[in-house]
Amino acid sequence: MLDTNNMAEKKINLNDAYSLKTPEDSIELYKKWAQTYDEDFAVSSNYQSPKEISFFFNKHSKNTDTPILDVGAGTGLVGEILNNKGERDIVGIDISPEMLDQAKMKGFYSTLVEADITKKIPLQDNSIGAVVSAGTFTHGHVGPEAFDELLRITKPGGLFVISINSKVFIKNGFKEKFLNINNKITLPIFKEFNAHADHKNKTFNEVKIIASIFRKKL
């Protein structure tokens, strides 16, 4: 179990996020981190995943890829970029009500849903046009089992643009999962990028992300 009491006495950082083991850990961590997450993490670490995932979405999306589901929406980093690009029908889903409160204040989402995506997602079958995610499929957060529910709620032909931490891509079964669902998805395109740009912390600079881009088969 994550020791969140000690976190109250020190600044929360990336190592704390990587220490997560259960959904309950995530709820506790982001409850304490929500109000300062953007400044403490996204800005200070020059976090690139929201920008990269939004770039790949814009590159591969069609007009029919709507509504967009932002998985692990957090404080709304991806939603903000997509909204600024003209997207208006964006649904944000996250396990942390405190993070969603921050996203709500920014006003970039048409709908916000508090849910654990490792369980049944409270959205209808074939109701989502595209799924994007930055920073959710990583150490101690969400594993590949979530793709079954995400495919259920996505329309046939719907676009997926998902960031996966490279260190867990094989170890945690993401590669195997894509092979197992190859009858349900198009051949994925994989693009690697740095999670953090030109950061003075060597550990941050070594974090690699795999953008996984595919569509649900018709």
Segments the model singles out, each with a brief description of its role:
Residues 145-156:
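A short glycine-rich, Lys/Arg-flanked "PGG" loop and its adjoining helix->strand segment in the class I
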Residues 172-194:
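Conserved Class I S-adenosyl-L-methionine
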Residues 186-218:
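Class I S-adenosyl-L-methionine
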Residues 157-165:
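Conserved beta-strand signature within the Rossmann-like core of class I S-adenosyl-L-methionine
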Residues 69-120:
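Class I SAM-dependent methyltransferase SAM/SAH-binding core
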Residues 47-64:
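Conserved alpha-helix/loop element of class I SAM-dependent methyltransferases that forms part
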Residues 2-24:
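N-terminal auxiliary segments of SAM/dcSAM-dependent transferases
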Residues 121-131:
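A short acidic, Gly/Pro-enriched loop at the edge of an enzyme's catalytic core
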